Amino acid sequence: MTAPTRVVVIGADAAGMSAAHQALRTARRTGRELAITVLDKGTHTSYSACGIPYLMAGDVASAEDLVARSGDAHRDAGIDLRMSTEVVSADLSARTVTTDGGDVLEYDELVVATGAPAVVPDWALRPDGTPYGGVGTVKTLDDGASWLERFAEVGDGGHVVVVGAGYVGVEVAEAALRKGFGVTVLTRTRGMSMLEDEMSDLVNVGLCDAGIELVLGAEVTGLELDGDRVTGVHWDGGTRDADLVVVAIGVRPATAFLEGQVELTDGGALRPDPHGRVADHVWAAGDCCEVRRRLDDEWVFRPLGTHANKHGRALGDSLAGGSLTFDGMTDTSITRFSYGEVHLEIARTGLSRSDAEAAGHEPVALLTEGTTASGYMPEAEPIALWVMADRTTRRLLGVQVVGGHGAGKRIDAAAAVLWAGGTVDDLAWMDLAYAPPFSTAWEILQVAARRVAERL
């Protein structure tokens, strides 16, 4: 009798568990026998990290609501799941991994799905390497629970400084406002750097209208402390008192244990092939990886749950003898800022202007403003769309949206055209749904596309 293939998966969240379960499903179809062990240094598995800001805001009742599948459910499916178990080293030539408890596990196939922990700058850390009191990141369920405790401890009327104005920074700023705090957002850029300047400026106006103190071009230089607890933040242009400081400046792949054994990017990421392979008997998926952007064939670091789940599914299928592939993405993302009278849905897909120029395109882009519904309907809210196409080929290159209720998911129609390699004319003339509560007779996305088409 043939021994089962020993599969060790490092990481028990979206990519790792998607890979493990898909491998089991495919193995049943292909007649293979797998023995899958999943190791994770954390205490929670299969949870929505993207939902943590909404837990902090009070939209989500408890941290457990963010858990999609419990550890016992994974074990019942036939997976040997070991939580609170960190892999500290791997020997790819010997095909072994070593845990923090000293256990050495042999494998036939290794799946790296270690994710990407939040970056914490030196100014936020005590000499022992832990964050100062009142300072933290937003990445894990434990982080979310800690912020709820800190919010309750400080109480209404305190002040939160958020460092970083990306998606997480904006979402956390909303959460802090809704919990009764004053909020300052510090960013070294001119706003949301994933947007074009004119679109980022619209978001900046909304944040300020909601009562946020937004400081652009700010480089944090240190903290004001009382003992080892934060009381303020210093940057190159000023100081702000702070009861709490949220660091939201990005993440970095957890791949240090692989250095010198597989090729890593300068940022520490892996680049798996469409099946998920990075080397013989080594696979990878999720936030520890870069993904291929289909529009310009560039590898980019986009740690999103959508990519992690698809990546993991394709990997698991291929590992067990299937043929699924993860064929890249169009760089689509979305978020929301909603407080008081301000509601902004923020979305983008495709290339930026600088990306397009670097890829050799001659981009033509226009900003178009309109409403999310027919103007006579009470649902109608402002919306702005930025659309870009190539002057010669007419190929659609990028779309960005900032607007009120109903604005954000319009990005999906544009993403579909980009996925298919379509033109701005395809977007302008495709058949989209219309009724007055949902759009204007000429859908504003198509008006924006038509205006660009007329400039080519």
What name fits each language-model region?
Residues T2-D80, A173-D197:
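Beta1-alpha1 glycine-rich phosphate/pyrophosphate-binding loop at the start
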Residues R29, E33-A35, R75-T99, L105, ...:
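A Rossmann-like FAD-binding core segment of flavoenzymes
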Residues T2-R6, G16-M17, E290-H405, I444, ...:
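Mid-to-C-terminal Rossmann-like scaffold of FAD/NAD(P)H-dependent oxidoreductases
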Residues M1-I10, R29, V67-H159, G217, ...:
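FAD-binding core/adjacent interface of flavoenzyme oxidoreductases
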Residues H405-G422:
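A short, polar/charged loop-to-alpha-helix boundary motif
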Residues G11-A15, K41, K139-T140, V163-V168:
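Glycine-rich Rossmann-fold phosphate-binding loop(s) that bind the pyrophosphate
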Residues A420-L456:
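Cysteine/selenocysteine-centered motifs that mediate thiol-based redox chemistry or coordinate metal-sulfur cofactors
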Residues T130-G155, L225, R229-G232, T239-D317, ...:
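FAD-site-proximal beta/loop scaffold in flavoenzymes
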